[in-house]
Amino acid sequence: MTDETASQEASQSTDAAAPARGFRKVREGLVVSDKMTKTVVVAVEDRVQHPLYGKTIRRTKKVKAHDESGTTGVGDRVLLMETRPLSATKRWRIVQVLEKAK
């Protein structure tokens, strides 16, 4: 019995010692530029409510995203995920292409 409890305690201590990873942000956006190698510029839209008037406002932010395969083009709707810094301004990567441009 003592061997079982010792192994259970050891497994629990290693789980507790490992730092918990944070939740990665996922966004959907539209590719607006693909002129860089392995990098695309994606316009990400965010809808926020005005603090005083309550009207819903669309805010757009352009982010640079890593495109390893280079298959995305201008006008494609893509799914982005936050990642470690890949360059001075690139902190997102493309997870999948949701819709190709027509």
UniProtKB/Swiss-Prot annotation:
Pfam families: Ribosomal_S17
Biased composition annotated in UniProt, kind: Polar residues: 1-15
Xref: Gene3D superfamilies: Nucleic acid-binding proteins
TM ranges: none
CDD domains: Ribosomal_uS17 (cd00364)
Function: One of the primary rRNA binding proteins, it binds specifically to the 5'-end of 16S ribosomal RNA.
Quaternary organization: Part of the 30S ribosomal subunit.
Family under the similarity heading: Belongs to the universal ribosomal protein uS17 family.
Name of this chain's protein: Small ribosomal subunit protein uS17
Origin organism lineage: Bacteria, Bacillati, Actinomycetota, Actinomycetes, Frankiales
Gene that encodes it: rpsQ
